[in-house]
Amino acid sequence: MLYTGTDIIEIRRIKAAEARWGEHFLNRIFTPAELSLCKDRFPSLAARFAAKEAVIKVLSLPKNQSYTEIETLNLPEGQPSVNLYGQARDKANILGIKHLSISLSHCREYAIAMVVAQD
């Protein structure tokens, strides 16, 4: 079976949240590895935030899901990949999810992520 999740976000929302809450916001949402990976900062962070939301949708996770349990990094070839920890990993195991494929994109104003889960 295939499961899909998509999310889109305005990049300015991530900028505004960082301006308002600073490092506390960033550390609550992103892992240290994700933060170090995002060179063009806000477009990349917004795409990774959208990825986390798409994974939450694909796995039907609760609203209070810890965002740092969903990590989006890059494979050596450059394509994005998802690592799951804690409750997110447990839910994927319950659903029999063996593989998550992810696509990220952004333009000047928006970032989008699409996740396909396969059992």
Curated annotation (Swiss-Prot):
| Function, as annotated | Transfers the 4'-phosphopantetheine moiety from coenzyme A to a Ser of acyl-carrier-protein.
- Recorded GO MF terms: holo-[acyl-carrier-protein] synthase activity; magnesium ion binding
For this chain, the family text in UniProt reads: Belongs to the P-Pant transferase superfamily. AcpS family.
- Assign the protein's first listed, main location to one coarse class: cytoplasm
The alphabetized list of GO BP terms reads: fatty acid biosynthetic process
Q: Which domain of life is it from?
A: Bacteria
Q: What EC number(s) does the entry state?
A: 2.7.8.7
This chain belongs to the protein called Holo-[acyl-carrier-protein] synthase
Q: Please report the organism this UniProt entry assigns to the protein.
A: Dehalococcoides mccartyi (strain ATCC BAA-2100 / JCM 16839 / KCTC 5957 / BAV1)
Write down the required cofactor(s): Mg(2+)
What HAMAP family does the record point to? AcpS (MF_00101)
Q: What is the lineage of its organism?
A: Bacteria, Bacillati, Chloroflexota, Dehalococcoidia, Dehalococcoidales
Record keywords, A-Z? Cytoplasm, Fatty acid biosynthesis, Fatty acid metabolism, Lipid biosynthesis, Lipid metabolism, Magnesium, Metal-binding, Transferase
Q: Gene3D superfamilies annotated for this entry? A: 4'-phosphopantetheinyl transferase domain
Cellular compartment(s): Cytoplasm
Q: Which Pfam families match?
A: ACPS
**Which residues are Mg(2+)-binding?**
D7, E53
Q: Which InterPro entries match?
A: 4-PPantetheinyl_Trfase_dom, 4-PPantetheinyl_Trfase_dom_sf, ACPS, Ppantetheine-prot_Trfase_dom
| Reaction(s) catalysed by this chain's protein | apo-[ACP] + CoA = holo-[ACP] + adenosine 3',5'-bisphosphate + H(+)
| GO CC terms of this entry | cytoplasm
